[in-house]
């Protein structure tokens, strides 16, 4: 496993304050950077729909599991802050045969994205799964099981992408151990 100077040692099983388990949250459109600029799509959730403990977490990269659930709703076109129109399909294109509805591993950022000069906190969840379509408007329930590293600023997009890839590698290895896999069941309740 690649280890960087900024990585925090990850225990063999989650310890306080983990696990943190959310209720179902709305998946909303973000800035469109995860997919288009970085090649790393994220499911963005409103911070105000999360448990208060999430707001108290140190800014940085975390890992856990998530379950996406479609919502019965008509398709909508929603305008983002940048003026781009995004289709909200509420998860109507999620495919059970593709594994889209299973509990899936995630890497998530709780932060302000200093590379993009944000001055407000966001929670962006990268689900480690190959979805065939977007699912804005669907619901997501997720847990946070541990902390990888603090939020960093970057001098280049390439350096940011490389660190995200390392975050994914570390998270996959940890989440593939039984003490962490045992927490998948929390999302089925």
Swiss-Prot record:
Its recorded reaction(s) are: riboflavin + ATP = FMN + ADP + H(+)
Cellular component GO terms held in the UniProt record: mitochondrion
- What top-level branch of life does the organism fall under? Eukaryota
Please state the pathway this protein functions in, per its UniProt record: Cofactor biosynthesis; FMN biosynthesis; FMN from riboflavin (ATP route): step 1/1
GO terms (BP aspect): FMN biosynthetic process; riboflavin biosynthetic process
- Enumerate the UniProt keywords alphabetically: ATP-binding, Flavoprotein, FMN, Kinase, Magnesium, Metal-binding, Nucleotide-binding, Transferase, Zinc
**Entry EC number(s):** 2.7.1.26
Residues annotated for Mg(2+) binding in this entry: 42, 44
In this protein, the active site sits at 124 (nucleophile)
Q: What does this protein do?
A: Catalyzes the phosphorylation of riboflavin (vitamin B2) to form flavin mononucleotide (FMN) coenzyme.
Give the EC class as a word.
Answer: transferase
* InterPro entries associated with the record: Riboflavin_kinase, Riboflavin_kinase_bac/euk, Riboflavin_kinase_dom_sf
What's the cofactor?
Zn(2+); Mg(2+)
| Record protein name field | Riboflavin kinase
Return the cofactor note field: Zinc or magnesium.
